[in-house]
């Protein structure tokens, strides 16, 4: 008796594998017909953890009009997120990078989300290239172009 169990990948894992909804690594002989999926990466054995974080953080980011396209975890515990805007009325999707350490990762990502959702007077959101959230009391923001100085009357 032979049993066949269908596997539906939910994410790309590293360069040549896929992940099941449970975070199991799948090696597929032919994957040309698969739709574009999030790209996840991390040390061997970390696939379930990376997938869990992806789901958690993508849901948080979706709440402010952002989508998590790719997530990777380094061996030393740094998380790199590739994020894009999907806000209605935006001229185009804008990708940018977020970096956060394992230490207080949820708190620091939450701090970014609060700032992002509350403040766009200077149009800075459209200029984000990279944000480093590894600082205990703030974040470093790299912009594509410098903002124009605000003038007060």
Please state what every model-predicted region is.
Residues 1-153:
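Charged, solvent-exposed interaction patches on well-folded alpha/beta domains
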